[in-house]
Amino acid sequence: MHLDIERIPTGIPELDAVLRGGLIRQRVHLIEGRPGTGKTTLGLRYLIHGASTGQRCLYLTLSESREELLATARSHGWSLDGIAVEEIMPLPPETASAQTILLPTDTELSALVGRIADQIAKSGAERVVIDSMVEVRLLARDSPHYRRQIIDLRQRLARFDATVVLLDDLTADGREYELQSAVHGVVTLEQLERSFGAARRRLRVVKLRGGDFQSGWHDYAIQKNEILVFPSLIAQEHRRDDDVRDMSSNVESLDRLVGGALSAGSSTMIVGPSGSGKSTVALQYALAAVESGCHVGYFSFDESESTLRSRMVEHMHQDAATDEQRRFHLQRINPSRISPGEFIWKVRRIVEDRGARLVIIDCINSYLDVIREEKSLLLQMNELFSYLSNMNVTSIIIGAHSARLDTSKEPDALSIITDNIISLRYYEHENVVHKAICALKRRDGRHEHDVRELYLTDAGIEIGERIAVPVDEIGVANFDS
């Protein structure tokens, strides 16, 4: 249990959510990370928000010039009006010229700490950023000396009405722990290079003395004029109990095959080879949901918006493509430019901001490429399915494969945690390739076990009769039931 403490918003709402309200007022916090992770950008965002609310803000730079800092702000389209920017040289030129090879580090470091404290006291700032502690560390003769000076600085700052953010570079020798233990809060920024596509950025709160926070890694992105943080999903924190709706396909034979309408909050996986009709079946459910007045979120990793909408016109009704009520929310996702956290955040926004009752992911194979390096597909998807279930949102996940369902391999492994499975296949009969469909699983009820013909016509989807040819003439033998 944590005592009531006053929080200071960072200017990044989602980061404040991770921090359970923001930084702790009148405390010293550390933002650390390797060069290029966005420490300066985050520090500027913190001060800009303070200045916008009328607070006195101070940026103390020990490494960059004022002009360089202003250029960084301009690159994001930001103005530093209302923010005092002061340069403090760790070693003044007149002092440096008088030094011998034996530097009196005790005097220099103590003087630097004193100058920092004096500048903050003089400004009367309520928000302070000090960039960067690397310059301070370089003046320390050893770790104990550095730690003593940091504690001295922290004690001096405690006399002021200021919430201070220190910026520091992570080092290979592990010396960042010296600073971590001396401050009240620590946020670590990390940038991971991928074999192809954009680098992935993520952050975590290491500690927040006296305050609660959401632990774990959270993806973030730096855009031209803002920083976006995507808090990791905790399904149990979300629930929506109103307006429970099952999802019918509006195709009687398809509903009968899968055992009725898809239950509200259930997850369904549609699997099959390329071109077998997976997306078309999913779009049929989307069309039915839109016609019933529900909002639908459709996330496409593979096909363009124009291709999907033309397919809706070709196989379904024109009304679905025009969608005058704007209930069909189609988003094209580039798997090489998005992080797992950002994708889940997009799903949440469709559900929470638009009130979507059906979410379709097409297809999961491309999403696998986004998170393959984490080796946590089942954990992340299970959390997403749990969240959607708690929000009474029905989900459909499309997975492409060319062989029999194999739950030991991706993406078929997802079938273990989904509630329903619809399988599509090709089969050859009398030198003609046909499409087949069957239901393999329904967790909350019974379903048909017949393999039936699937037709994609100008009028829409049609489910034919049970396929009566011998099994060895069908290219989809050994269906699981």
Where in the sequence are the language-model features?
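Short glycine-/polar-rich loops that comprise or flank the Walker A/P-loop
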Residues: 26, 53-56, 81, 161-162, ...
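Conserved nucleotide-binding/hydrolysis micro-motifs of P-loop NTPases
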Residues: 63-67, 75, 89-93, 134-136, ...
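Conserved P-loop NTPase
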Residues: 1-2, 6, 114, 123, ...
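Flexible loop/N-cap segments at domain edges
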Residues: 249, 255-275, 280-282, 326-333, ...
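Walker A/P-loop NTP-binding active-site region of P-loop NTPases
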Residues: 18-83, 87, 257-319
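P-loop NTPase motor core
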Residues: 29, 101-182, 186, 337-421, ...
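Short beta-alpha junctions and helix-cap segments that line functional grooves
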Residues: 46, 71-74, 169, 173-177, ...
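Conserved inter-motif catalytic segment of the P-loop NTP-binding fold
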Residues: 55-138, 294-372
